Amino acid sequence: MTEWFLGLAFLLGIFKILNMSSLAVAPDIYIKDRSSAFVKSILAACPIFLEPYIPTLIWGKSGHIQTIVYGKMGRVQYPDLKGDRHEHIMSDGATSTFDVYHPLSEHQAGGDYSLLVCPGIANCSESPYIRTLVHMAQRGGYRVAVLNHLGALRDVELTSPRIFDYGSTQEFHHMVEDMRKIYPNSSFLAVGFSMGANIITKYLGEHPDHQKHFICGMSLCQGYDVIQVRPQLMSFFLPRLYVYAMTENIKKMLQRHRNILFSASAQEKYGSFNMEKIFSSTSLEALDEAYSCKRLGFKSLDDYYQSCSSGNYLNNVTIPMFILNALDDPLVPPCLHTIPREFAESRDNCLYVVTRHGGHLGYFEGGYFTPSPITWIDRAVLEFANAVVTMEEKQQ
């Protein structure tokens, strides 16, 4: 009898972890006016927002498993891509790079359209989830430019003693300007994932001129306010594990580029670093305090995080926006959803979409155990992009 109860408890525990009793439902959509021409046009062209998102049956309703699978695999399958690498030497000597992938067919609207993609933390054009989206967009007639965050490419040496940071828009800005010169007749759509979504949103809101080059922006799974999210991530066991994993990843990057990041000239420029503190850090807070704040000249973590957070710039954005979060994202808790929700409900041209499932950048769907190679988030990006392009074409 005891063994029976233990077996039942085990099965109930697995059932609870997998969240299998949760229903697959359509996303919640927050907008100002459902009867507006913009919203009606978008929803008519984007059935994905009105239909249930059905995660992979066995494990897809667990935000933690979605996030872990994304973190370990990126995507189930991803193509080998051939693109053109572009370099930009910045004023401090840093070499910013981005890769351009050309359309594999003509766009259905007949025009020239480019997705400008900013990946998540420590990611680049080689990241599996980026490659999956790029290939799908190419097949849909889009040119795709992907920013490589400083230090993220393993085979590219740094030429200046710095890596990326959460809120720097310099590299994205230079990619935009270079793309404008190379493809002056192309219409741009901004796409950002997680930290990259923070960067593109901040970039768009920093200066009104930045928005003139884009017909829309797409912010996917970002947290909006780093100061607000800090206590949430450090208060619970599993989020702390994710933070630890991200910290270890960045420490490996620092170690890989150690010779230039902590060279004599770097120490002369930024002051001496406490190497023991940096490489013994077990959280992003500790690492940022020991490294990022010192390199960037901030006196406190709050000052640094305040400067980085896109929520301070969001209200300046006036172009059409698609903003996405998942309720079960372990890195972006629902308490942060107030910022984009209030923004969307005050704008005529913004959709804030919140799914019940998806985790952090997971959004795997289809199948019982093995998901489809194409995720829900890939399909959502392309449907929204096509809808905005169609609206643009009608207005011309």
Feature annotation, model-predicted:
Residues 11-46, 181-296:
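Alpha/beta-hydrolase-fold enzymes
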Residues 59-110, 172, 370:
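N-terminal cap/lid segment of alpha/beta-hydrolase-fold proteins
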Residues 101-158, 174, 178-181, 334-337:
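Short, surface-exposed "cap/lid" segments of acyl-processing enzymes
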Residues 162-183, 202:
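Alpha/beta-hydrolase active-site loop
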Residues 290-313:
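Active-site nucleophile elbow and catalytic-triad environment of alpha/beta-hydrolase enzymes
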Residues 317, 323-325, 329:
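Short beta-strand/loop motif that positions the catalytic acidic residue
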Residues 333-350:
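Conserved loop-alpha-helix segment in the C-terminal half of the alpha/beta-hydrolase fold
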Residues 356-396:
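Catalytic active-site module of serine/aspartate enzymes centered on a nucleophile-bearing elbow/loop
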